[in-house]
């Protein structure tokens, strides 16, 4: 049976401004809730870990520690950070060993499985919530992923029929992520913009007719390619947006990074980096050029600068970078051409259901992969991306006469683009 309903992706729609806005400046718009943006990191090995999660936190992004991190480390971190667990890990930790959990604390857990349509998942979550109350701790549960508005309605009823809210957050969206091939190979998907809209309609219905907060918070997961997608997801009714590949393209991500010569490098000093002209460049002040040349001359034989030079020797402006490169190249300090030296750095990004993702978790490929590995250009510093995101979101809210996220989320009109603009998700 073919459903006679049009489904929209983010790029199929555009946000309509209010007739009149009472906002005088975008600076009046508050895009934060309790100090955080409405954004989670995807729990992906090539995005976030126990080593860099604070980079996200200090930029107002909520990190989720992925399943490739040792379980003992995740157990330690769950007292102050979201962590991801497999269903088996979740069942063991919060049911079999629930009596070992420290009382009087709150734990934020993402049960990270691909198929959020399994009833068994929610039955286990209900038991875990019951154990949490008996053992005097608070368990906040995120599950997913789902790709049917009816499943969201079922979860609202599920929460309503229990004496407590079992599922607090739900990730919606299957197959839209850059590292996911579920849709192309398994044919499971629901157009993301329409999915958010339909789930939000259910949420409004239950809030109106039950006067209870029984519906899970909506997390739009997958398919975020640009700032406008974040804005559209929120406008359609998502409480939060989850981002994977875009954050992998930040220099602070945990993905393996390669310079223009395909040489793997490490990043030691985030603050010294800057993005310029499509590549990753070093950050310098006016006097930094001469000083850095002297440092390079002193350390050129150690191999350190030879290894890290694609990130640490390029200047703030491309002209200065070329001048500096000429200096190094003419003195034969570097066995790279200028073109190679100024080449685009890349990051290795993979879905957690890919072969690389499975190996990162268990050390071996365990099943047919529904994810892929890609090498993406490094395009941002995290703080730079967040600065842009905050500015663009405030701008959208000012057009829509919204002073805060509560006014903005789910309360906007969107309209389909012209035919020539539709279906450009992979542009």
What are these regions (language model features)?
Residues 1-217, 245-250, 424:
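Active-site entrance/lid segments in N-terminal catalytic domains of soluble metabolic enzymes
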Residues 1-21, 187-220, 225-427:
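Alpha/beta catalytic cores of nucleotide-metabolism and tRNA/nucleoside-modifying enzymes
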């Amino acid at each position: 049976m073919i459903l006679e309903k049009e489904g929209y992706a983010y790029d199929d729609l555009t946000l309509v401004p209010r007739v009149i806005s009472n906002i005088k400046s975008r600076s009046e718009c508050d895009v934060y809730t309790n100090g955080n943006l409405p954004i989670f990191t995807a729990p992906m090995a090539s995005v976030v870990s126990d080593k860099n999660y604070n980079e996200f936190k200090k930029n107002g992004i909520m990190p989720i520690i992925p399943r490739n991190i040792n379980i003992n480390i995740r157990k330690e971190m769950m007292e102050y950070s979201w962590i991801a667990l497999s269903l088996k890990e979740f069942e063991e930790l919060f049911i079999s060993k629930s009596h070992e959990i420290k009382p009087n604390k709150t734990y934020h857990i993402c049960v990270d499985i691909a198929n959020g349509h399994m009833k068994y998942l929610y039955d286990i979550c209900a038991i875990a919530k019951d154990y949490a109350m008996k053992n005097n701790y608070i368990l906040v549960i995120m599950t997913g992923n789902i790709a049917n508005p009816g499943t969201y309605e079922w979860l609202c009823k599920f929460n309503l029929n229990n004496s407590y809210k079992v599922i607090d957050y739900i990730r919606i969206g299957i197959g839209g992520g850059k590292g996911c091939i579920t849709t192309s190979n398994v044919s499971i998907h629901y157009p993301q913009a329409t999915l958010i809209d339909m789930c939000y309609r259910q949420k409004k219905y239950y809030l109106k007719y039950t006067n209870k907060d029984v519906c899970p918070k909506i997390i739009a997961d997958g398919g975020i390619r640009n700032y406008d997608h974040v804005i559209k997801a929120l406008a359609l009714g998502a409480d939060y947006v989850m981002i994977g590949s875009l954050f992998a393209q930040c220099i602070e991500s945990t993905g393996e990074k390669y310079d223009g010569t395909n040489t793997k490098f490490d990043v030691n000093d985030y603050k010294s980096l800057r993005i310029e002209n499509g590549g990753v460049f070093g950050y310098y002040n006016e006097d930094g050029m001469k000083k850095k040349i002297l440092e390079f001359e002193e350390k050129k034989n150690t191999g350190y600068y030879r290894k890290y030079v694609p990130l640490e020797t390029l200047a703030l402006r491309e002209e200065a970078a070329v001048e500096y490169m000429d200096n190094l190249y003419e003195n034969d300090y570097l066995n790279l051409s200028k073109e190679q030296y100024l080449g685009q750095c890349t990051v290795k990004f993979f879905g957690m259901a890919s072969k690389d993702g499975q190996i990162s978790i268990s050390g071996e490929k365990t099943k047919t992969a529904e994810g892929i590995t890609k090498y993406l250009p490094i395009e941002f510093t995290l703080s730079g991306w967040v600065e842009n995101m905050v500015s663009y979101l405030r701008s959208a809210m000012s057009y829509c006469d919204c002073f805060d996220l509560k006014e903005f989320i789910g309360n906007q009109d969107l309209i389909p683009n012209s035919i020539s603009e539709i279906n450009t998700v992979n542009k």
